[in-house]
Amino acid sequence: MIRIDAAWLATTPLDMRAGTDTALARVVAVFGAAHPHHAYLFANKRANRLKILVHDGIGIWLAARRLHQGKFIWPLAGGANLALQRPQLDALVMGLPWQRLADGGVITVI
C-alpha cells in the first residue's frame, strides 16, 4: 500500500490525456513542489474523471478513476486549492460527498 500523509485537491481542471510528466509539471506549477507521501488530485472539466499523483519518496505514481454515472463533487475552478483529510480523500475517490467529512463525530471532551 502506498503511504499518503497529506492530500491536496487542485481546483483547475487537468486534461486527462496527461501522463506522469505532464501531471508532475502541473503539481509543481500549482503547489510549488511534489512532496514525498503527498497525493495531488485533479479532475477534468466535466468532473467525471479523476487523476491522483502520489510521490512515494522513491518515484511517482499516477492513478486514474472514471465515474460511469454522475460526477465527482469538485470545487469551482479558480478557487483556492484544498487540503483533504483521509476520510475526505476516501469519500472523494469513491464519488461520494466529502465536504463535511473530516474529524466530525469525534468526541474529545466528556
PLM features per residue range, with description:
Residues 1-110:
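Polybasic/polar functional segments that serve as interface/processing modules
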